[in-house]
A protein has these predicted regions:
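Short, strongly hydrophobic alpha-helical membrane anchors
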Residues: 1-13
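Extracytosolic (periplasmic/ER-lumenal) interhelical loops and adjacent juxtamembrane/interface segments
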Residues: 2-3, 69-116
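Membrane-interface loop-to-helix entry segments
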Residues: 13-20, 113-131, 188-201, 205
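Hydrophobic core of alpha-helical transmembrane segments in multi-pass integral membrane proteins
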Residues: 15-35
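Structural signal for the C-terminal ends of transmembrane alpha-helices
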Residues: 29-40, 133-142, 205-210
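Membrane-interfacial loop-to-transmembrane alpha-helix junctions, especially the N-terminal start
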Residues: 45-50, 153-166
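N-terminal signal-anchor transmembrane alpha helix
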Residues: 49-71
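Membrane-interface helix caps and helix-loop-helix hairpins in membrane proteins
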Residues: 178-191
């Protein structure tokens, strides 16, 4: 049994660190949208955040393709961290052992970083979609409670669209985990890619309906 096979497939120890990293990365786009559209209506800010999230999701999909094509999908053979750590820095010893055991195998320091950056970006996109879902529900609720003449409107977008998108991105995260733990099983990899296309479509619908 090599070092990669001996590694547990799921190790939830670094979850809090990974979530924190995702939130930290998501703060950049959130602050940018807020500052750029300060003084504008909530609908305009939601539209801008939706378009930016769509752009970042497209970038994430491209980076996911790069992760697969560079053979980095198993750079960290467990999920959600890397050998139970929040980054490859904490897994230097385990990565070195796996690389020594399989010099041409899928685990190297470079591939581990590619895989973990993909996970960091995916977490940040997930957080942005969570913000969109919550913010849309809040704005729609305020509109329903406001006097009819003072309603500014969030166009014709239903709050269910961001909610469905949030559920879907959670499913995408689950497929991302299966992609790793099932050792890049072709059917799972294909479904994960198709899921990314559906996620892009959901965000496109929201972007054009604002």
């Amino acid at each position: 049994m090599n070092a990669m096979d001996a590694q547990p497939l799921y190790d939830l120890a670094p979850v809090a660190w990974l979530l924190g990293m995702g939130v930290l990365l998501a703060l950049g786009p959130l602050i940018w949208v807020w500052r750029r559209h300060v003084g504008e209506g909530a609908g305009r800010r939601l539209q801008a955040l939706t378009v930016l999230t769509l752009f970042l999701t497209f970038d994430l999909t491209l980076f996911g393709a790069f992760t697969r094509l560079s053979d980095s999908g198993l750079g960290c053979p467990d999920w959600p961290g890397c050998y139970g750590n929040a980054s490859p820095l904490g897994a230097r010893h385990e990565i070195a052992m796996a690389q020594a055991a399989q010099p041409t195998g899928p685990v190297t320091h470079g591939k581990a970083w590619v895989e973990m950056v993909h996970r960091y970006l995916a977490t940040s996109v997930g957080f942005l979609i969570l913000v969109l879902a919550v913010a849309t529900w809040v704005v729609r609720r305020r509109e329903r409670l406001a006097p009819h003449g003072s309603r500014r409107g969030v166009a014709s977008l239903s709050a269910w669209w961001p909610a469905v998108t949030l559920v879907w991105v959670c499913l995408q995260g689950a497929f991302g985990a299966l992609t790793v733990t099932w050792k890049l099983y072709p059917a799972i990899v294909t479904l994960h890619l198709l899921g990314a296309m559906v996620l892009l479509a959901l965000l496109c619908i929201q972007a054009v309906r604002y």
